[in-house]
């Protein structure tokens, strides 16, 4: 038999209601899960069960930073219209302000949902209210916190609020240098700082794919086959240039690489993180006729 805590977890997973609402719903219905779900719907806490199955793949990035701390959160909604709505914008600003005050590099996104906004309602409760008003599934997807007493923290939020970057730099970097490098990361999407930081399992997998592709290309051409190893090495090297920050041509001055620019400044990138709304989420495809039909049946 499930414990009270397990029932609350299951109810939260099913309905996305707050922990306190789930606890109350179960208490009002003798720990009957189905009745608790019905109670939450009847009381307007969960507006629609159908909403829970939808994919929140749109949204916005919100961040707050100073020279020694930066916090960044991805908020997902189902449409860009809601992502740009005043309701979500107001919530995002309140939430990120509290996150900046309280969060540390080890804070989880689940912990953020329990923060109180201006000493009143919790983040999860306000989030549920915004979801109810906009009639969309809205979730806090991920969080990143950088904090340093000795190094400089920089950030960049693109104008569309769909791409955000935070980075930590050691050395003589001023505000403009930091902003430009953060903009470069936003535009060029590096995955690693340099080759020493490249995930070796990932690289081995990519190298294997490159080898297979190259072998197929030369299988009927003995002359090209003689240069197979050089071809593979060249493509792996190009891949490393593309994905490593220090190897990329610097966005502000393409006559030099990012690595050369950092060397001129006697500086070093310690960490960087780039968030882009919806990356890694498979957005559900609904044809127009089906969408209209679904709306008419509501």
UniProtKB/Swiss-Prot annotation:
| Protein localization | Cytoplasm
Q: Which InterPro entries match?
A: EF-Ts_dimer_sf (IPR036402), Transl_elong_EFTs/EF1B (IPR001816), Transl_elong_EFTs/EF1B_dimer (IPR014039), Transl_elong_Ts_CS (IPR018101), UBA-like_sf (IPR009060)
Alphabetic keyword roster: Cytoplasm, Elongation factor, Protein biosynthesis
Give the region (Involved in Mg(2+) ion dislocation from EF-Tu) as residue ranges: 79-82
Show the GO cellular component annotation of the record.
cytoplasm
Per the annotation, which location comes first and is thus the protein's main one? cytoplasm
PROSITE patterns, alphabetized: EF_TS_1, EF_TS_2
Which Gene3D superfamilies does UniProt cross-reference here? 1.10.286.20, DNA helicase RuvA subunit, C-terminal domain, Elongation factor Ts, dimerisation domain
Keyword Cytoplasm set for record: yes
What is the top-level taxon of the source organism?
A: Bacteria
* One Pfam family cited in the UniProt record for this chain: EF_TS
| Any GO MF annotation of the entry | translation elongation factor activity
According to its UniProt entry, what is the function of this protein?
Associates with the EF-Tu.GDP complex and induces the exchange of GDP to GTP. It remains bound to the aminoacyl-tRNA.EF-Tu.GTP complex up to the GTP hydrolysis stage on the ribosome.
Which family is this sequence assigned to? Belongs to the EF-Ts family.
Report what the protein is called: Elongation factor Ts
* Lineage, highest ranks first: Bacteria, Bacillati, Mycoplasmatota, Mycoplasmoidales, Mycoplasmoidaceae
